[in-house]
């Protein structure tokens, strides 16, 4: 039996015994985790999810926390900054060994769900977003939801950030330069995926700019 699972925005075809390198998970070596986003199960009977196969899961043992090969990015700052520089980056990964594929019963297995380290560190940011509790409110209340909180920084001072992008950041719970300046690589990856920035944070040099702007 094999399964096609999704984690960290990527898809992997796996079977029991496979060693897999995935984006860093919030788990320690020796722990068993369960991937619940299973797109397809194959074998004697093929089951395709819509989008995921109900009650299916892939269990794996965390072997080690590792780093991928170094990637060099050429960063060119625009608008207020004209400097250019190169930046090296090694993606943090987790090495896991697939131990079992569950066609059913995954929901009640009791095994810890595989969760990206970036998702865990961004939990507070996601919880701070007022969007879920405001859906049933009138239109005026929804507009107020997107407005900056009192004392919030002017995020439009960041390179490439206009009114629309500022609104998107605020809705994601980001209201100050101090928050952005404190982002880790995992936070950057999580915000990239959550708000579909497609590498904009590093490309525009937001973290460096935020550190300077936070000083006042």
From Swiss-Prot:
It holds the Pfam family HHH_5. GO terms for cellular component: cytoplasm; ribonucleoprotein complex; ribosome. The keyword Nuclease does not apply. InterPro entries: bL21-like (IPR028909), bL21-like_sf (IPR036164), Ribosomal_bL21 (IPR001787). One of its GO terms (biological process) is translation. One of its GO terms (molecular function) is rRNA binding. Keywords: Ribonucleoprotein, Ribosomal protein, RNA-binding, rRNA-binding. The keyword Lipoprotein does not apply. Gene3D superfamilies: 5' to 3' exonuclease, C-terminal subdomain. This protein binds to 23S rRNA in the presence of protein L20. Part of the 50S ribosomal subunit. Contacts protein L20. Belongs to the bacterial ribosomal protein bL21 family. This is Large ribosomal subunit protein bL21. The lineage of its organism: Bacteria, Pseudomonadati, Pseudomonadota, Alphaproteobacteria, Rhodobacterales. The gene is rplU.
């Amino acid at each position: 039996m094999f399964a096609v699972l999704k984690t960290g925005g990527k898809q992997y075809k796996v079977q029991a015994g496979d060693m897999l390198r995935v984006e860093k998970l919030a788990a320690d070596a020796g722990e068993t985790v369960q991937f619940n986003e299973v797109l397809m199960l194959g074998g004697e009977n093929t089951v395709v999810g819509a989008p995921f196969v109900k009650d299916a899961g892939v269990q794996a043992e965390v072997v080690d926390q590792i780093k991928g090969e170094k990637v060099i990015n050429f960063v060119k700052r625009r608008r207020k900054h004209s400097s250019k520089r190169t930046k090296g980056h090694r993606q943090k990964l987790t090495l896991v060994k697939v131990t079992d594929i569950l066609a059913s019963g995954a929901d009640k297995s009791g095994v810890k769900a595989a969760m990206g380290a970036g998702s865990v560190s961004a939990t507070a940011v996601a919880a701070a977003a007022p969007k879920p509790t405001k859906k049933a409110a009138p239109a005026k209340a929804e507009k107020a939801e997107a407005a900056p909180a009192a004392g919030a920084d002017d995020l439009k001072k960041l390179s490439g950030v206009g009114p629309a992008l500022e609104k998107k950041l605020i809705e994601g719970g980001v209201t100050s330069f101090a928050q952005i300046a404190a982002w880790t690589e995992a936070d950057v990856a999580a915000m990239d995926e959550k708000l579909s920035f497609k590498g904009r944070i590093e490309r525009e040099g937001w973290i460096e700019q935020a550190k300077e702007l936070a000083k006042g």
